[in-house]
Amino acid sequence: MPYEKGPELSGARLEEADFSNARLHAANFEGAKITDAWFYNADISGDLEGLRLNGVEVAPLVAAARARLFPELTQLQAADPQGLAEAWAMIEARWQATVSRARELSEATLNDRVDDEWSFVETLRHLILATDCWLRRMVKGIDRPYHPWGLAGSWLSDPGAWGLEAGANPSLDEVLEVRRARMDEVQHTIAALTSEELERVCVPPDAPGHPNREHTVLACLHVILNEEWEHHRYAVRDLAVLEGN
């Protein structure tokens, strides 16, 4: 079942609301307070900073558990050129293996969504956009950094303002060609880094796009690495379902 645009509930007070089996996507719970709730067999993902469950700060516990489950996460927080190069090499190797695995399936299957999440092809298109946002717009300062096939979430109400084609339907090979070029850009940028360059503050161009505030080069690269790692995890998860079908 596709998602519907949700109601504006900022400041609302709800009692005895039944959300059993509900699906909430891109929901903002900043400052929300939920009491006397039942979270049996619930699945929550997202940013958890400041979240408390029964009086306990959750984020540090989740971070520690994820570090045990995924030891490679420490690589993604590298703060020097060599460490970043090693982290990116790990990302590239994982995606190369996963794309080879995905090619065993039909292209139609790779455009199928699992549980209404992005398809494999859509995931690759989103990562093109992520690179355009954080590398081309921020680190390189390009005014119009976006490839038209980049894919944003529902939060972007006017993709055309960024130069994105909302109705684009490129083939897997076409997407992979753009994706390869973007990954090469990341690799070349990291290879040329110095420790001083990592501390440089990037000012976003005065043009439509995201982000809209300053970040260091290191912070931008950390976002790219985390986007790549998280979406690779989702892609592998969904490929397993598609293979089973």
Residue spans for each PLM region:
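Tandem repeat scaffolds
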Residues: M1-R68
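Short, helix-capping/interhelical loops that line the mouth of catalytic, cofactor-
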Residues: E57, L61-A87, L135-M183, L242-N245
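Amphipathic alpha-helical repeat elements characteristic of tetratricopeptide repeat
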Residues: A78-P81, A85, E92, E117, ...
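Alpha-helical packing segments of well-folded alpha/beta enzyme cores
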Residues: A87-T98, A130, W134, S171, ...
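Long, well-ordered alpha-helical segments
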Residues: A97-S106
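Short, contiguous alpha-helical
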Residues: E107-W162, D184, V201-N245
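Proline-centered turn/helix-capping motifs that create local helix->coil transitions or kinks
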Residues: D143-R144, Q187-E199
